[in-house]
Amino acid sequence: MTMRSSSPSSSSSYSLAFTSLSNRLETIFKKASELCTLCDIEACVIYYGPDGELKTWPKEKEKVRDIALRYSLLNEALRRKKSVNLHGFLNKKKNKGLKNPNKKMKTSLKNVNILKYPLADHYPPDQVSPLIQSLELHVSKFQERLRFLESQKQNQTKPDHQSLTPSSLNHYTQSLNPSQFSLFMYNHGDNTLSQIPVSASNFNQDYFSALLEESELKNQLMKPEICGYDQNQNMSMGDITNNKFQDPCVSNKEAVQESVNNFGLNQLMYKEFYGCDQNMSMGNINSNSFQNPCVSNTQHYSAVEESVKNPWLNQLMQNELYGYGYAGFC
């Protein structure tokens, strides 16, 4: 019973092995054909089956016999030069690894599934929306960074000596405070001095040149040199009410009286006519011994006395005479 039961199992295993061998034989013939085509070499396969059946590739016996004869004529060294079997192949690979123990094998850290399939296919539907939002956020950050780098590159390519932009001109104009400037126009016809309001918007070179030409301030600034005295001489303020006050540059006494009462002309008289400096003494301001070559009429000194008695004008005179500076009368 045992022998009979074992015979069908052995016959089935034998048939499976024969089928596997026949399949492998077809694969071997196919590989030999590919080697001859791709490598442009001559190759042949000689196969003997379990029952002694002979199979060759190529099927022409003459070609197989010729290749086998040439191979048999080679010496042993040439025969074993590229000859390898499974045992020899594994030993060769093992010895190669032992010769280079420090050599690192190249490994890929990427997941095979990520390379095969798209990334979004592995996410459930409820996680796809947060993933899209995260990607959009990163894209917006990259775009912003790109715009910043492009603008920085454009700024570097621009020349350094560029003209002023309107915003910089506005800033420069606003820095000129109009309250720090005063502009006076003197009329030689009626000997009057009037103050003109100047703002930062119209305080430019063309406007100022036109005012200089209209008021003839250039001629007025040249008068101290024509009259023959300089502005650095020291005069005593104790003689301001003297009847002998004279000046060859002034011929109209009514104009002098009107100009003295004017606040702006007082500044001009102290700076241009009198030529006084900050070291003058105020001790003898009401004395009658005041003299000045710029006033020709000695009878009309009452206007000068009236302007001196004015407390506001006295304070202004003290600021100029005692060294507080002329910054407010530029």
From Swiss-Prot:
Keyword annotations of the record: DNA-binding, Nucleus, Transcription, Transcription regulation
One BP term from GO: positive regulation of transcription by RNA polymerase II
Any one GO CC term of the record: nucleus
Localisation per UniProt entry: Nucleus
Alphabetized Pfam families for the sequence: SRF-TF
Residue span(s) of domain MADS-box: 19-61
Record GO terms (molecular function): cis-regulatory region sequence-specific DNA binding; DNA-binding transcription factor activity; DNA-binding transcription factor activity, RNA polymerase II-specific; protein dimerization activity
KW Transcription (keyword) present: yes
Domain of life the protein comes from: Eukaryota
Quaternary structure (record): Interacts with MEE14/CBP1.
Function of the molecule: Probable transcription factor that may function in the maintenance of the proper function of the central cell in pollen tube attraction.
The name this protein goes by in its record: Agamous-like MADS-box protein AGL75
Source organism (scientific name): Arabidopsis thaliana
High-level lineage: Eukaryota, Viridiplantae, Streptophyta, Embryophyta, Tracheophyta
Gene coding for it: AGL75
